[in-house]
Amino acid sequence: MQDVLLQVQAVSKSYHDGDVTTQVLTEVDLQVFKGEQLAIVGTSGSGKSTLLHIMGTLDKPSAGKVLLAGEDLYQVSSARQAQIRNQDLGFIYQFHHLLPEFSALENVAMPAFIQGTDRAQAQADAKMLLERVGLGHRMSHIPAELSGGERQRVAIARALINKPKLVLADEPTGNLDAKSGEAVYELIRELANQLGTAFVVVTHDPKLAARMDRQLTMKNGYLQAVAEHAQ
């Protein structure tokens, strides 16, 4: 029996603009298991990115619960939420959001510095991760000196620096060419298998999603289907 890491229970999300209400998510239920690779697919506006943001405490649900390792993420203080984001969750975005004036090594180590990890240890961990993602020779380079695929690899290493339980990735290959996107997806799968970290990946590409352990389809704010993929 698989261990449940994250539970989304009857989550809905709506936005209000005067008398107009826009329903983005409607009573979504799902589970993420420890160490699994889960894809969420759907067209633009289907609600998949909003769901990911709610899972990561970046946006608050209008109704429902989100539990990480049994802890209700929306019944804790904002300080505790920030701690969870830094220690237990990792984030990867379509655009890398690296700090432009810092080297690859410094960018990867930054979340560890924020957590209070000893500087030497944080840099050693960052070096190990950069070597693991194939950038051991590019550690001193700033983002402007790296290719798009290399910058996204730095972002993946940064997401893993604090050994999170779960990494949330929003269109991580959306800004890359096909070859670089393929390499990033293979890297995510490899690291998930090696480190035992769970990944939830939002993507518009069904071919790439089909390589994950499971695939969820979002349509008009509803969870439509769950596809199990043979390993």
UniProtKB/Swiss-Prot annotation:
Cellular component aspect of the GO annotation: plasma membrane
Gene transcribed to yield this protein: lolD
Residue ranges of domain ABC transporter in the record: 6-231
Bilayer topology: Peripheral membrane protein
Molecular function as annotated in GO: ATP binding; ATP hydrolysis activity; transmembrane transporter activity
Keywords: ATP-binding, Cell inner membrane, Cell membrane, Membrane, Nucleotide-binding, Translocase, Transport
Enzyme class: translocase
Residues binding ATP: 42-49
Keyword Membrane: yes
Name recorded for this polypeptide: Lipoprotein-releasing system ATP-binding protein LolD
GO biological process: lipoprotein localization to outer membrane; protein localization to outer membrane
Chain's role: Part of the ABC transporter complex LolCDE involved in the translocation of mature outer membrane-directed lipoproteins, from the inner membrane to the periplasmic chaperone, LolA. Responsible for the formation of the LolA-lipoprotein complex in an ATP-dependent manner.
